[in-house]
Structures are given as C-alpha cells and as structure tokens.
Amino acid sequence: MANKQIIDKNDDLQAHTDRNDKPIATIESNHKENKIPDSEKKIVYSTKNLDLWYGENHALKNINLDILENNVTAIIGPSGCGKSTYIKALNRMVELVPSVKTAGKILYRDKNIFDDKHSVEKLRTNVGMVFQQPNPFPKSIYDNITYGPKIHGIKNKKVLDEIVEKSLRGAAIWDELKDRLDTNAYSLSGGQQQRVCIARTLAIEPDVILMDEPTSALDPISTLKVEELVQELKEKYSIIIVTHNMQQAARVSDKTAFFLNGYVNEYDDTDKIFSNPSDKQTEDYISGRFG
C-alpha cells in the first residue's frame, strides 16, 4: 500500500482533524529521534489470549499484546471497540463492574495480575491512571498531591513538601502553582486540573501511567501542554494512552494498537500505522472512512 493513498485522502481526514492540523501521514514525529531499539527495551505488560465479558457482552476477544517500557503506546479505535475496557483491565479497574469475567492472562513485569497472590492495591500503586475528565479532589492543591503518599504512611512535612514540588515539576506546572498550593484544586482551569491529576499520579511513583482520553475535555493550548508532558514523562515511565484524536496518537506515541470490535486489528510502530498500515480496516479508520 503506497503512502500516497493515505495522503490523498485529506477530505476524509476532516472527520478526525481540526483545520490547523497537518494530515496524519505528514505529521513529523520529532519524539522518535534517537529512539532506543525495541530489542533493547523490556516488556512491561504482556497480554496473552485475554477475553473479557460484561455479562453476556463479549467486550475483548483474544487480545495478545506486548507493551514496551519507556514507550508511549496509543490505543485507538471507534467507540465501543474495547480500548478503554482494555486499559482498565491493566490495573483491574474493570473488576469494579460486578458482571465482569475474564479469561487469559495479563502479565505485568512477568507476573499474572489476575493471580490471587497479586495485590490489587500494589498493582494500582505501580500503575497509575489519569481519566478523561479532570477529577481533582475537593481539597487544596497540596492535599491533592499528598493524598497518596499519606495513605502509604508518609507523614513528615518536609518529605511531603518535597513530594509536592517534585510531582508538580514532573507535571510541568510547579511554576504556575507554587504560590497557590493552599488553593482549592476546583478553582483551577481544566488544563491545570488535569496536570494536577497527573502530578497526583506521579506522587506515588508509579511504573506505568494509563491515560484514558486525557485531553478530550481540554482546550487546544492545554492539550498541547499535556502532549508535551507525555513526551517528557516517557523518559521515566511507560505510558499507555487511549485517544480518539488521530493527530495526537501520531504525535505522541511510539507504538499504536488499533482496536476494532473487541479485537486488536493491528499493532505496530506508529509511523507505520499512520503511513503504511497493513490492514485495509486500519487505513479506513485513520483516513476517516468510519469511526
């Protein structure tokens, strides 16, 4: 399949682009410069023959997927394809739905997360999550960031102060908020709230960060700041991001998995997915023919 096939579909791309965006296939991926070869990276998550049901609804079907550490992995696909269900399975949040049942394995650092010996609390400490809508607690910025560390037994004020600064710096928002730490987080803008939520996740020092449509409720400027932050965070963390925004997936991710009807339809380097996909359905989706 020639690259020109996708580039020529600019009219179809309008379903997924805003008028200031470049066509997907021509987006430059500056974050991929000096890329470490995949062969030198460890597998952080390995999903093996995973099936998941909500009652009678077969939401995930025979998922096999290896996710590399210190990568940004994008999960894309039309509504209802299973992408949000999948990342919520990665930290067992799907189990909050009473009717859920699973078959198969998800290995996190070579250990099956569904094993009875695997602590859900420890898993969710290692695997943080940022949701679609910013969800700060109705507390001060300081109390939002220190909530997790306090639950884990940290009481020393000096240590907590250091965690707050480190976490807010990690979320690229320290300079904006350092003189407002006693302010209620609800008073912040949507973009600031989302970065505070990211800082709150960083405060517990996770290994993996799951992001479920983290910028869908944000304005373009705030979205850009979060995207830039994602690129910085992957130096220390493995990031898995669900997004409907094709340009965002192309800009920020190293690998992309296209989900369709509960299956992984295609999984490859992001450059290849967006310039020369192997599957016609993948091409049709990223070109705006459906979804």
From Swiss-Prot:
ATP binds at residues 77-84. Residues 1-21 are annotated as: Disordered. Its main location: membrane. It comes from the Bacteria. Residues 45-286 form the ABC transporter domain. Its EC number is 7.3.2.1. It is a peripheral membrane protein. It catalyses: phosphate(out) + ATP + H2O = ADP + 2 phosphate(in) + H(+). GO terms for cellular component: plasma membrane. One of its GO terms (biological process) is phosphate ion transmembrane transport. Keywords: ATP-binding, Cell membrane, Membrane, Nucleotide-binding, Phosphate transport, Translocase, Transport. It is found in: Cell membrane. SMART domains: AAA (SM00382). InterPro entries: AAA+_ATPase, ABC_transporter-like_ATP-bd, ABC_transporter-like_CS, P-loop_NTPase, PstB-like. GO terms for molecular function: ATP binding; ATP hydrolysis activity; ATPase-coupled phosphate ion transmembrane transporter activity. The complex is composed of two ATP-binding proteins (PstB), two transmembrane proteins (PstC and PstA) and a solute-binding protein (PstS). Part of the ABC transporter complex PstSACB involved in phosphate import. Responsible for energy coupling to the transport system. Belongs to the ABC transporter superfamily. Phosphate importer (TC 3.A.1.7) family. This is Phosphate import ATP-binding protein PstB.
